[in-house]
C-alpha cells in the first residue's frame, strides 16, 4: 500500500482561516468585545452639549474623560465651543467625587446648570461687576423659558439654591465644595479661607493653566484657542491701567467678551502648595493638566501634624525645544523664542564659513549677510532641487534682528576662542603673575568686575539665553496639635477648626439650607423676579436666594432670633449662638417629621392629590423600629391596635391636625408635636443672668437640694421632663397641686406658655438633659438674675434626635460649677462597678473615680443569660431599660402581645432606653440586651456606663440574649 505524504502545516496555513471552528472562535471573541463596548456605553453618562465640536475636539474629550460621558451634541453655534463643553464635563466630574445626595457648595458656578439637573448644590454667585449681573439675568430668563416650554417637568422642581454673596461671606455649611473656573478672583489663599468659613474638608476645582505664564508675558493655549497676555499694574494711576498685574484671556477669532483676572491670584495656584489657618492646614494637589485645563484638589487636615515642607515642580514642556534670542536693542525688541534646532544649524553654518574670521570682522555687511543666509538655510533645506521646511519660521518683524543677534553670538565665540588660545601661550613672568590673580589676565576684565560700565554692551549681553525646563517651589507649614485653643469669642464665631473632621460627614447629608444673615456693614442688593411661569418669589434676606423649605404648621415670624445692634461680649455671644442653633434644630426636627411621613405615605401608594393607599404592608415592617407607626382609617378605626392619642397626622394635605373621618399616617413624632411652638418661644435676646452648675454624681441628693433651696415667693423650679416635674410636685405640693403647677414647670412649658409671675431665681433639675440654647431661652423668658442647674455633667447629656444636624453649642457653658461626689442612693457594688468602668474607658479626670456612697446595700447587681426575650416574663413591679431603640421596640412588642399591665404608670413609662430614663429613681431595674456581643458597658458612651445607677435597692439584673 503506497503511503501518501502531505504537509499538514502548509494545509493549515493555506486554509486554516476558513475552518468553521476558527470562524466560530473569532465570532465569539468579536461578540464579547462588542457586548463589552455596549455595556461601557450604557454605563457612561449622557451629557447634552450645545456646542459644535470637531472630530479632533471629540477625540480630546474622549481622551480626557475616557468613557465617563457620552456626548450628545445639539450642534448650536456657540462661542469657544471646546472650552464650554469641557467646562460642562468638568462640573459633572467634580460632583461625582462626593457622596450622592450630599449637599455640595459651588463657588462661582452656574446655579441654572444645577437647577436643571436637580443637583443638591448651593451656588455662591457674587456680583463682582455688571457682567455677573447680566449672567444672573440670563439665567433667570432661561429658567422662565424652561418652565413655560415644559411646565409638566419644571414646575415640580424646587427653586434654585444660590446666593449673591461671596464664598467667604456665605454661611451655608458643607464638607464638600467645587470651584469650576471660579478661583481666578479668589486665589489659593482666598479659596482656603472660604473653605474654612464653610467647614469644607475637600474641594475639587478646575482652571485654565499655562506654565509659560511664569516665564513669558504672552502665550497661546492652542487646544482652547485662547490667547493670554499679561498687563503690568499701575498702582499710582499714571497710565490708566488696573492697580495690580492682570492676565487677559482672549479667544482667537471670536469677538466675544474677554476675561481678565488678577495675575497674583492665578500665580498662587502655580507657586503655592499649602496654607494654614490656626490648627487647620490646607494642602493643594494638582491632578490632571491637559488641553490647557488644570484639575486640582484642596484638602483640609487637622490634628497632630509635624512641621511640613511641601515641594512641587512646574514644568515647561512647550519651551523645552526653544531658546531665547535677545536682540541687540532691548528698548525696542523683546525676547524672541527660536527653535533650538534652528540655532544649532546657524551655529554650524557659522563654524563652517569658508571666509576667514579676520575678514568677517572687517567686512560687517558681508558678515551680516552670512548670518541672514544661515538663518534662511536653517529654515529650509533643498533636496534634489526641491525646497522643504526644516525648521520653524520666524515672525517677519523679528527675522533680521534674530539673524543679526545669532551672528554676533557666533562672532563673540570666535573672540573668546582667540583669547583662550592666547592664554595658553607663555608670555613671561609678568603675564603669569597677573593670570594668578585672575584667569584671563586682562586688565579690562579685572576693572570691569568692579566697574561694570567699563565693559562694552557687546561683551556683557547674552545673545542666546537657555530657557528653564522646570521650576521648583517649596512651601512650609507649621506644626499643629490636636488640642483646641479657642477662647469664648472664637467659640462664638466657631469656624470648626479641630472639630472639622469630626462633624464633616454628619453635615454632608444635611440638605437644610441656612441662608446667610444680613450683615450690617455689607451692602446688599435684593433681586425680585415676577413671572407667571416661575411663580411668586418669596422675600428672603438681602443678597440670598434659596430653595424652598418645608414650613411647619402655624410658624410665625414675629419672634425670630436676630443679631443685636450692640456688640456682645464672649459669654453673651455664645448664648445667642446657642439659642439660634436650638431654634434651627427644632425647625429641622419638624421638617424631618414631615419628610419621613411623606416618604412613608409615598411607599404606601399615597399621592399629594389622593388619600387612597395601595398597600399598607410597609407599615408592618416600620413598626419593628417604631411601634407607634399606625394608619387612621376613614371610619375612625386604626390599622393596628392603638392606645395613644396623636396631636397631628399626615396625608395628602400635609402634616397637621386631622378630623376623625380622615385617612392619615402617624408615627412617634406625632404624639407630641410641639417643635414649632417651642421654636416660636425662643426669645431674640440672650440672658444676662448668671448660670451656675451643681455637678453631682448619681444619687447625690440633687432633687433634695432643690427642695431645700426653694423659696416660694421668688423661685421657679424647672425640670427637663414631665416625670421629674411630677415627682417634685408630689414631694413639695402634695396637698396643693394647683399652686405647685405654677411653681414647678417643665422646660417646654416655659418656652410655650411663658411665666405668669416675677422670678428672681430659677432652679433647674437635670439640666444636662437640655440644649444649652433652651436653657438660655428659659433664663431670658423668666427674667431671673440667676439660674442654678442641678445635674451630672458626665452622665447622658443632650442628645440630638437628628444625627445629621451639626451641633456646636449644645453643651453647657456655666459661669461656675461645684462638684458633689457623695451618693445616697447607689449601693456599694454599683459604686465599685462604675469605678471599674470609668478606668476601663480611660476617664482619668472623672469625678466617679473618687465617689463614695452612704448606702448600706452591699449587693444589688446580677446578670442572667436567656436564649430569647420570651424566656423572661415581664414583671409588673420592675422597670426595664434597653441600650438601643431596637431592643426597646422588641420589649414593647412583647408587652402588647402578652397584654402586659404594669402596677404603676403605663407601658411606655416602665420600658425605656437608658437615655430616656435619665434622672429617674425606681426600686427595681432590669437592663435588657438583645445580643451577646462584646459588652457595650466598657465603651466611652455615657448612657451605657450609667445604666446601672437607677435602682435604689437590691434589684438590678442584666439580661443577655444568647
Curated annotation (Swiss-Prot):
Boundaries of every (+)RNA virus helicase C-terminal domain copy: 821-962
Ranges for region Disordered: 536-561
Entries under Gene3D superfamilies matching the protein: P-loop containing nucleotide triphosphate hydrolases
UniProt xrefs under InterPro entries: (+)RNA_virus_helicase_core_dom, 1a_necrotic_phenotyp-det_dom, Alphavirus-like_MT_dom, CMV_1a_C, P-loop_NTPase
Keyword Nucleotide-binding: yes
PROSITE patterns recorded: ALPHAVIRUS_MT, PSRV_HELICASE
Pfam families the UniProt entry points to: CMV_1a, CMV_1a_C, Viral_helicase1, Vmethyltransf
GO cellular-component term (any): membrane
MF term (GO), any: mRNA methyltransferase activity
Annotated EC: 3.6.4.-, 2.1.1.-
Membrane topology: Peripheral membrane protein
Biased composition (Polar residues): 546-561
Entry's family note: Belongs to the bromoviridae replication protein 1a family.
Entry function: Involved in the virus replication. Contains a helicase domain and a methyltransferase domain. The methyltransferase domain is probably involved in viral RNA capping. Involved in the formation of ER membrane spherular invaginations in which RNA replication complexes form.
Protein name: Replication protein 1a
Species whose genome carries this gene: Pelargonium zonate spot virus (isolate Tomato/Italy/1982) (PZSV)
Amino acid at each position: 500500500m503506497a503511503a501518501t505524504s502531505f504537509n499538514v502545516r502548509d494545509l493549515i496555513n493555506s486554509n486554516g482561516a476558513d475552518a468553521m471552528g476558527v470562524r466560530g472562535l473569532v465570532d465569539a471573541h468579536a461578540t464579547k468585545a462588542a457586548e463589552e463596548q455596549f455595556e461601557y456605553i450604557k454605563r457612561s453618562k449622557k451629557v447634552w452639549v450645545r456646542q459644535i465640536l470637531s472630530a479632533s475636539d471629540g477625540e480630546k474629550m474622549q481622551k480626557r474623560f475616557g468613557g465617563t460621558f457620552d456626548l450628545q451634541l445639539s450642534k448650536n453655534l456657540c462661542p469657544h465651543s471646546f472650552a464650554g463643553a469641557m467646562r460642562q464635563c468638568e462640573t459633572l466630574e467634580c460632583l461625582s467625587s462626593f457622596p450622592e445626595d450630599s449637599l455640595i457648595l459651588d463657588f462661582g458656578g452656574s446655579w441654572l446648570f444645577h437647577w436643571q439637573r436637580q443637583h443638591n448644590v448651593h451656588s455662591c454667585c457674587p456680583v463682582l461687576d455688571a457682567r455677573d449681573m447680566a449672567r444672573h439675568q440670563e439665567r433667570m430668563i432661561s429658567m422662565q423659558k424652561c418652565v413655560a416650554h415644559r411646565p409638566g417637568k419644571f414646575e415640580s422642581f424646587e427653586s434654585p439654591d444660590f446666593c449673591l454673596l461671596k464664598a467667604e461671606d456665605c454661611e451655608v455649611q458643607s464638607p464638600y465644595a467645587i470651584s469650576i473656573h471660579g478661583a481666578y478672583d479668589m486665589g489659593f489663599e482666598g479659596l482656603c479661607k472660604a473653605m474654612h468659613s464653610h467647614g469644607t474638608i475637600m474641594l475639587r476645582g478646575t482652571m485654565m493653566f499655562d506654565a509659560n505664564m511664569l516665564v513669558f508675558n504672552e502665550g497661546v493655549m492652542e487646544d482652547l484657542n485662547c490667547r493670554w497676555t499679561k498687563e503690568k499694574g499701575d498702582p499710582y494711576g499714571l497710565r490708566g491701567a488696573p492697580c495690580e498685574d492682570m492676565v487677559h484671556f482672549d479667544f482667537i477669532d471670536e469677538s466675544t467678551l474677554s476675561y481678565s483676572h488678577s495675575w497674583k491670584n492665578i500665580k498662587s495656584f502655580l507657586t503655592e502648595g499649602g496654607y494654614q489657618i490656626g490648627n487647620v492646614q490646607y494642602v493643594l494637589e494638582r491632578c490632571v493638566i491637559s488641553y490647557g485645563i488644570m484639575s486640582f484638589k484642596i484638602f483640609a487636615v487637622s490634628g497632630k501634624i509635624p512641621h511640613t515642607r511641601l515641594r512641587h515642580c512646574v514644568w515647561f514642556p512647550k519651551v523645552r525645544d526653544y531658546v531665547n534670542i535677545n536682540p541687540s536693542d532691548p528698548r525696542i525688541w523683546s525676547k524672541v523664542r527660536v527653535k533650538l534646532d534652528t540655532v544649532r544649524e546657524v551655529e554650524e553654518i557659522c563654524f563652517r564659513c569658508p571666509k576667514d574670521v579676520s575678514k568677517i570682522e572687517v567686512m560687517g555687511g558681508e558678515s551680516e549677510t552670512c548670518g541672514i543666509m544661515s538663518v534662511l538655510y536653517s529654515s529650509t533645506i533643498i533636496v534634489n532641487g526641491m525646497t522643504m521646511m526644516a525648521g520653524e519660521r520666524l515672525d517677519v518683524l523679528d527675522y533680521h534682528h534674530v539673524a543679526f543677534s545669532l551672528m554676533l553670538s557666533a562672532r563673540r565665540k570666535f573672540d573668546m576662542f582667540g583669547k583662550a588660545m592666547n592664554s595658553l601661550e607663555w608670555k613671561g613672568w609678568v603675564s603669569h603673575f597677573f593670570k594668578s590673580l585672575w584667569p584671563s589676565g586682562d586688565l579690562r576684565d579685572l576693572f570691569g568686575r568692579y566697574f561694570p560700565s567699563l565693559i562694552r554692551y557687546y561683551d556683557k549681553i547674552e545673545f542666546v539665553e537657555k530657557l528653564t525646563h522646570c521650576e521648583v517651589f517649596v512651601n512650609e507649614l507649621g506644626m499643629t496639635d490636636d488640642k483646641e485653643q479657642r477662647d469664648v469669642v472664637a467659640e462664638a464665631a466657631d469656624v470648626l477648626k479641630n472639630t472639622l473632621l469630626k462633624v464633616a460627614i454628619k453635615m454632608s447629608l444635611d440638605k437644610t439650607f441656612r441662608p446667610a444673615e444680613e450683615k450690617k456693614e455689607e451692602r446688599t442688593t435684593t433681586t425680585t423676579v415676577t413671572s407667571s411661569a416661575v411663580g411668586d418669589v418669596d422675600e428672603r434676606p438681602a443678597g440670598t436666594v434659596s430653595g424652598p423649605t418645608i414650613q411647619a404648621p402655624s410658624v410665625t415670624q414675629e419672634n425670630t432670633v436676630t443679631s443685636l445692634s450692640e456688640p456682645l461680649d464672649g459669654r453673651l455671644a455664645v448664648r445667642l449662638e446657642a439659642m439660634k442653633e436650638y431654634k434651627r434644630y427644632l425647625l429641622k426636627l419638624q421638617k424631618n417629621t414631615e419628610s419621613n411621613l411623606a416618604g412613608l405615605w409615598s411607599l404606601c401608594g399615597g399621592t399629594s392629590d389622593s388619600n387612597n393607599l395601595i398597600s399598607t404592608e410597609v407599615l408592618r415592617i416600620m413598626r419593628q423600629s417604631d411601634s407607634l407607626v399606625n394608619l387612621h382609617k376613614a371610619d375612625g378605626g386604626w390599622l393596628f391596635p392603638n392606645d395613644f392619642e396623636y396631636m397631628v397626622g399626615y396625608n395628602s394635605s400635609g402634616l397637621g391636625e386631622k378630623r376623625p373621618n380622615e385617612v392619615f399616617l402617624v408615627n412617634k413624632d406625632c404624639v407630641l408635636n410641639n417643635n414649632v411652638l417651642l421654636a416660636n418661644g425662643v426669645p431674640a435676646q440672650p440672658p444676662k443672668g448668671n448660670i451656675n452648675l451643681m455637678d453631682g454624681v448619681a444619687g447625690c441628693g440633687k432633687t433634695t437640694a432643690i427642695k431645700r433651696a426653694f423659696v416660694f415667693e421668688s423661685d421657679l423650679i424647672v425640670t427637663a421632663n414631665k416625670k421629674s416635674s411630677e415627682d417634685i410636685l408630689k414631694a413639695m405640693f402634695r396637698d396643693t397641686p394647683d399652686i405647685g403647677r405654677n411653681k414647678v414647670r417643665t422646660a417646654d412649658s416655659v418656652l410655650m406658655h411663658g411665666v405668669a409671675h416675677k422670678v428672681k431665681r430659677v432652679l433647674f433639675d437635670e439640666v444636662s438633659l437640655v440644649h444649652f440654647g433652651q436653657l438660655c431661652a428659659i433664663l431670658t423668658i423668666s427674667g431671673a438674675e440667676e439660674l442654678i442647674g442641678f445635674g451630672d455633667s458626665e452622665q447622658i447629656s443632650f442628645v440630638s434626635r437628628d444625627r445629621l444636624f451639626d451641633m456646636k453649642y449644645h453643651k453647657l457653658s456655666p459661669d461656675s460649677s461645684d462638684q458633689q461626689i457623695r451618693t445616697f442612693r447607689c449601693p456599694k457594688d454599683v459604686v465599685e462597678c462604675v469605678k471599674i468602668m470609668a478606668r476601663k474607658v480611660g476617664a482619668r479626670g472623672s469625678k466617679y473615680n473618687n465617689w463614695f456612697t452612704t448606702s448600706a446595700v452591699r449587693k444589688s447587681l446580677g446578670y442572667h443569660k436567656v436564649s430569647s426575650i420570651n424566656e423572661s416574663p415581664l414583671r409588673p413591679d420592675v422597670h426595664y431599660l434597653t441600650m438601643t431603640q431596637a431592643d426597646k421596640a422588641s420589649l414593647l412588642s412583647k408587652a402588647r402581645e402578652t397584654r402586659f399591665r404594669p402596677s404603676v404608670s403605663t407601658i411606655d413609662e416602665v420600658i425605656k432606653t437608658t437615655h430616656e430614663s435619665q434622672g429617674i429613681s425606681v426600686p427595681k431595674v432590669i437592663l435588657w440586651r438583645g445580643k451577646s456581643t462584646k459588652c457595650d458597658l466598657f465603651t466611652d458612651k455615657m448612657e451605657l456606663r450609667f445604666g446601672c445607677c437607677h435602682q435604689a435597692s437590691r434589684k438590678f439584673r442584666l439580661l443577655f440574649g444568647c
